[in-house]
């Protein structure tokens, strides 16, 4: 099977027919993926409504079933396979890129006032909402800041909305920042990471419920490889090459 080089990554070419079959299988696996633990109270609520509906109205039953199915879809947590190569910054979330531009990291992280490249990913209600670590390293700081709930696809969401910011120091001493940002519908940011945690690229660290945004600030001097409008797959899509 032929190989060809695409940038700095070697890609194995796949026949079109087989590629389509693989894509279909991957899509089915993603939809049927088990839910994130954060779904538990919502699933219990949906099932409870359906059970109560058995004694009241079939419409209530269907409402409970529909809500339960939606939660199973929204909170799906598919497995991801990070690239085998080290020295890469990976997407911290699924969605599509709404902004690639220099910006100053959140002041609460204490990373200084020098702008660095920021890649902002918008997550619609149809995207997987599990957040993943973009690099190997140590979580040096986590800072939560309350805020508004404006449309997460807008740039001002990075400044005005409720957010939870993490600083991750890589083994070489450089720092990457990831910011979980609540959106117009999302009203709950969950972060399982703790300061001092040693993490691996692609590892799960949290989830944002019902539509949101995730910003990633690259180390100073590192230029992103992605563009606005590009689709991101958390834990798999390469955002930047961190090799000095």
UniProtKB/Swiss-Prot annotation:
Q: Which chain regions cross the lipid bilayer?
A: none
Q: How does it assemble?
A: Heterodimer of a large membrane-associated beta subunit and a small pyruvoyl-containing alpha subunit.
Q: Which domain of life is it from?
A: Bacteria
What gene is behind this protein? psd
Q: Which residue windows are coiled coil?
A: none
Q: Which reaction does it catalyse?
A: a 1,2-diacyl-sn-glycero-3-phospho-L-serine + H(+) = a 1,2-diacyl-sn-glycero-3-phosphoethanolamine + CO2
- Tell me, what does this protein do in biology? Catalyzes the formation of phosphatidylethanolamine (PtdEtn) from phosphatidylserine (PtdSer).
On cofactor binding, the record's note says: Binds 1 pyruvoyl group covalently per subunit.
Named in its record, the pathway it takes part in is: Phospholipid metabolism; phosphatidylethanolamine biosynthesis; phosphatidylethanolamine from CDP-diacylglycerol: step 2/2
| Cell location | Cell membrane
- Which cofactors does this protein require? pyruvate
Tell me which residues this entry annotates as catalytic: 212 (schiff-base intermediate with substrate)
GO cellular component, as recorded: plasma membrane
GO molecular function terms here? phosphatidylserine decarboxylase activity
What the record says about family reads: Belongs to the phosphatidylserine decarboxylase family. PSD-A subfamily.
Q: Which Pfam families match?
A: PS_Dcarbxylase
What is this protein's record name?
Phosphatidylserine decarboxylase proenzyme
Q: Which organism is it from?
A: Granulibacter bethesdensis (strain ATCC BAA-1260 / CGDNIH1)
InterPro entries for the chain: PS_Dcarbxylase, PSD-A
Enzyme class label: lyase
User: Any idea of its EC number?
Assistant: 4.1.1.65
């Amino acid at each position: 099977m032929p190989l060809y080089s695409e940038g700095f990554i070697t890609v194995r070419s796949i026949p079109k027919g087989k590629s389509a079959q693989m894509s279909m299988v991957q899509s089915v696996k993603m939809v049927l993926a088990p839910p994130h633990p954060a779904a538990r109270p919502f699933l219990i609520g949906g099932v409870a409504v359906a059970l109560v509906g058995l004694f009241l109205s079939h419409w209530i039953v269907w409402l409970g079933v529909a809500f339960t199915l939606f939660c199973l879809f929204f909170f799906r947590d598919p497995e991801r396979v990070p690239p085998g190569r080290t020295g890469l910054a990976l997407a911290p979330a699924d969605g599509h890129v709404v902004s690639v531009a220099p910006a100053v990291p959140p002041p609460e992280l204490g990373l200084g006032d020098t702008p660095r490249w920021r890649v902002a990913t918008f997550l619609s209600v149809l995207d997987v909402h599990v957040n993943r670590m973009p690099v190997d390293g140590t979580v040096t700081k986590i800072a939560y800041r309350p805020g508004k709930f404006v449309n997460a696809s807008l740039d001002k969401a990075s400044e005005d909305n409720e957010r939870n910011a993490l600083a991750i120091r890589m083994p070489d001493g450089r720092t990457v920042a990831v910011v979980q940002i609540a959106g117009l519908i999302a009203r709950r940011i969950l972060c399982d990471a703790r300061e001092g945690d040693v993490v691996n690229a692609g590892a799960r660290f949290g989830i944002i419920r019902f539509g949101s945004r995730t910003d990633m600030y690259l180390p100073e001097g590192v230029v992103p490889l992605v563009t606005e409008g590009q689709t991101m797959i958390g834990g798999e899509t390469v955002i930047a090459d961190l090799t000095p």
